[in-house]
Amino acid sequence: MIDLKLHIDESFYKEEIRDGYTISSEMKKLWAVELDLLNEFMSVCKRNNIRFSADAGTILGAVRHKGMIPWDDDIDVMMLREDYDKLCKIASKEFTYPYFFQTEDTDKGSLRGHAQLRNSATTGILYAEKEYKYKFNQGIFIDIFPIENLSEDTKEVEQQCNRIALLRKKYLKYANWTEERYVRPHNKLKAFIKKIYYLLMQPYVRYIENPHKIYKEYEKELTRCKDTKTSKISKLALGKYENRRIWNRKDLEETIEVPFEMLTIPIPKGYKNILDTFYGSWQEFKIGTSTHGEIFFDVNNSYHKYINEKE
């Protein structure tokens, strides 16, 4: 287990049963890295007067379990666009190794659509991408989502979400022909053919369908209503139009402090309305319904071990 800045008592790492679910020692170690990331994130936000709150399952965990949902393995936070932009401006000087603030501006090719704070001494690689050995930072992370202002016109919001989803699909498609995301096939003949095609694609990808420029269009579309203080807000970075993701601004503007494992974190004052909208019957739960098992985690080794290893 790597050293963490956050002091965590050894007893935390013991296997235990919560709400009928067995939490392994390995899961506890993953939680510890994520809690350390969250603690560092909160420190930076506090120093710079940046507002944020827990998001989604992290709100639910705080309210229902006073910490992580026993079968969950990630932490999400959110902030209004103005605070998100402020964070992006100061992040590179505030977060130092092993903490890495990742956006497309700080780490080309990552293309997540939102920010992530990662621990560079660990590994958190999507299984779907593990064999590709992408060079961007793939340490264990917490997600940081911007919350956008929404038009009062529902049809306009639907159209905006469709444009966001299209741009997201487009930049990911053409990113596969950039140096950051190019994947060389193992078969020598296929590798040769793909390399030729890659070279032929370069003028097109560089000057016509440049994924980095498309990504900027995507970000611009996210912030279409940036300068208008609207009554409705949403997490648009996922590119899906869902009523459950549309919330009232008044529910998010103020926060309250609540226990979360060994930390105290802010959640929206109107958390009940947000949870009702997002989850429905959130006070009831089904064991094992929210884990993100599609990610390969290693709390002992940096992602460099895996992206540099030979086949």
Describe each model-derived feature in a short phrase.
Residues 154-160:
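A short secondary-structure junction signal
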Residues 14, 22-46, 91-152, 171-280, ...:
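Conserved catalytic core of two-metal-ion nucleotidyltransferases
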Residues 6-12, 53-58, 239-245:
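Short, functional N-terminal and low-complexity linear motifs
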Residues 1-10, 71-82, 177-196:
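Short N-terminal signal/transit or membrane-insertion segments
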